A protein has these predicted regions:
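Substrate/cofactor-recognition hotspot
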Residues: 1-117
Length: 117
């Protein structure tokens, strides 16, 4: 389920929605993105230890996608739904969105998300 195209597209869409709605002058943008994604998937407030786990996962994935742009672009290219104006984004922005997409995909796989409905 985690690697199905539709799941990857849903995660990418969630990441885009959360990332693109943040004001670029916000302090601690990454925490806000993590919180927004968490609330959309699990419909409850995020606890501090949960936030830190998401941020750690995001940072690890961002580092990996920075070091392997080909892998990043392949991951962002899966499926039909694409990030709007993706070609206009910087390498850093694409790495962030890929990392947030990976993080969102992990959120969808939590047992709490799978059994909520």
């Amino acid at each position: 389920m985690m690697n199905e195209t539709s799941m990857i597209e849903a995660a990418r869409s969630l990441a885009w929605l959360s990332w693109s709605s943040i004001e670029k002058n916000e302090i601690d943008q990454e925490s806000l993105i993590a919180e927004r994604m968490w609330r959309r998937v699990l419909t409850r407030p995020i606890k501090e230890n949960e936030r830190q786990l998401l941020l750690d996962l995001f940072e690890n994935q961002k580092s990996q996608f920075r070091s392997d742009p080909k892998q990043r672009d392949e991951f962002l290219g899966i499926g039909q739904w694409q990030i709007p104006n993706q070609s206009e984004l910087s390498d850093e922005q694409r790495s962030e969105l890929a990392a947030w997409s990976f993080t969102a995909r992990s959120l969808w796989m939590l047992s709490e998300a799978l059994t909520q409905y």
